[in-house]
Amino acid sequence: MTMTSTTTKAMAMAAAVLAAAAVAATNAQTCGKQNDGMICPHNLCCSQFGYCGLGRDYCGTGCQSGACCSSQRCGSQGGGATCSNNQCCSQYGYCGFGSEYCGSGCQNGPCRADIKCGRNANGELCPNNMCCSQWGYCGLGSEFCGNGCQSGACCPEKRCGKQAGGDKCPNNFCCSAGGYCGLGGNYCGSGCQSGGCYKGGDGMAAILANNQSVSFEGIIESVAELV
């Protein structure tokens, strides 16, 4: 078998692996207490029913971890609890990300400086579904994801589609049948208007790139070793 045919076969197999991983990661991935405490990748919310996604259905009532609309308690005010998804615990005992949480008095987590985004940074999006606040800084928690949130895991969700003059969602999120931006089956499934909608696997690559830590090169190398 030639090197060219081996590489071609490896790439074909890798593409199939990526497609399967995307569907599993964003359509049926379970988390939280329903799956041994598993954390969703890239700050996706784990819903009360144990599924990964973004939007009110996942980040609202009962949200177990991730970019939950209500900040979880932590630190000395939360019985010594640490934050999920490597978020910071603020001096007041709330989980989030950004200077209000990771700055002065931060109790645990990756204390760090703010990342600029949005209209004050040439439209830059925040990494890992973090919210871009109305002031143009990346973070998680009500100060970033609440009023004026420009992109990311905003609470409440941004409106889109025919219910919002044809607007599309930022971050390539899905626009649900009801006109709300988010990720997961409730947004990308039946009736999805735009974004990475589930259509027999079509459109999944963009969601995979934004929300799943999978290296295409790594898969190529791994598969090549098997052929």
Swiss-Prot record:
Organs and tissues of expression: Confined to root caps, several cell layers at the periphery of the coleorhiza and radicle, and in all cell layers of the coleoptile.
Entry keywords, A to Z: Chitin-binding, Disulfide bond, Glycoprotein, Lectin, Pyrrolidone carboxylic acid, Repeat, Signal
Gene3D superfamilies: Endochitinase-like
Residues the record marks as carrying a glycan: 211
Every Chitin-binding type-1 domain range: 29-70, 71-113, 114-156, 157-199
PTM sites of type Pyrrolidone carboxylic acid: 29
SS bond partners: 31-46, 40-52, 45-59, 63-68, 74-89, 83-95, 88-102, 106-111, 117-132, 126-138, 131-145, 149-154, 160-175, 169-181, 174-188, 192-197
GO molecular function, a single term: chitin binding
One Pfam match: Chitin_bind_1
Prosequence residues removed at maturation: 202-227
Database matches in InterPro entries: Chitin-bd_1, Chitin-binding_1_CS, Endochitinase-like_sf
Protein name (Swiss-Prot/TrEMBL): Lectin
The organism of origin for this protein: Oryza sativa subsp. japonica
